[in-house]
Curated annotation (Swiss-Prot):
One of its GO terms (biological process) is TMP biosynthetic process. Keywords: ATP-binding, DNA synthesis, Early protein, Kinase, Nucleotide-binding, Transferase. InterPro entries: Herpes_TK, P-loop_NTPase. Belongs to the herpesviridae thymidine kinase family. It comes from the Viruses. Homodimer. It is an enzyme of class 2 (transferase). Pfam families: Herpes_TK. The lineage of its organism: Viruses, Duplodnaviria, Heunggongvirae, Peploviricota, Herviviricetes. It comes from Feline herpesvirus 1 (FeHV-1). It catalyses: thymidine + ATP = dTMP + ADP + H(+). Its EC number is 2.7.1.21. ATP binds at residues 27-34, 188. This is Thymidine kinase. Substrate binds at residues 74, 98, 194.
Amino acid sequence: MASGTIPVQNEEIIKSQVNTVRIYIDGAYGIGKSLTAKYLVRADENRPGYTYYFPEPMLYWRSLFETDVVGGIYAVQDRKRRGELSAEDAAYITAHYQARFAAPYLLLHSRLSTITGYQKVVCEEHPDVTLIIDRHPLASLVCFPLARYFVGDMTLGSVLSLMATLPREPPGGNLVVTTLNIEEHLKRLRGRSRTGEQIDMKLIHALRNVYMMLVHTKKFLTKNTSWRDGWGKLKIFSHYERNRLVETTIVSDSTESDLCDTLFSVFKARELSDQNGDLLDMHAWVLDGLMETLQNLQIFTLNLEGTPDECAAALGALRQDMDMTFIAACDMHRISEALTIYH
């Protein structure tokens, strides 16, 4: 079926419940996730059902307010390097920009959660509706802030403040973390020339590592009840570890995941702990929130080294293993409205 405006009274969707797969496609910037999503929409035109893509909210970031958020966050780092801003002031401004990045994701997530957050369903057929959302709020509230912390652009306190606003995920979320070898990743970054964006190698390595740590975090939680399991034996997250994460891509998608491989490990810091090494309660609540968000998210990895058509086919094939929920047919028009506004 062709993609576009969702039919409200189409004979194809007249049942009371519409089986829906909700996919968040994510990863470091410049890998090719957005192109893959667009190619899947095109490929699905020849299959039953409807596929809709919510792109990155560039209009919101670049044109809706007085400041271009994409260019602005890089400009802050340039001003810091030139000595025009102190490291402390630059960190505060960076946190402000990062919150601005998060705003449209939070708005969309809140809107869709009231529509798509029904119980999981088992459906062996192709879904009636596939929703592909370019990035989960985890990106702007957890992954990018942590990467900025690793490179020295943000404080750990600012990261925790952003993470505290992370929304809970309703049932049926599927997060695809896209990956790519570093050589091809850099080649694609140089080819896209997005205005105001810079190729910051330390930030790129940090993001690649953070997203793999996110994958390990989910794996760890599938075998353990909480981030508290093994916390007492976990070593303090050192400056050495922090520096390693920005120099090269060192975290791989291995089969085993220990607590030290997860995002939780970053917060084993003296300034966040009491005299016994236990995380202070308010900070612990933030990690609890991350754990609760991940509870309703399946996480997949997808290598994008192939052609756009091949990558789209691989993304589409993942649907057979994804969680599915239903949307009430009477709510389909709300999806259409959200798609129109978000564009």
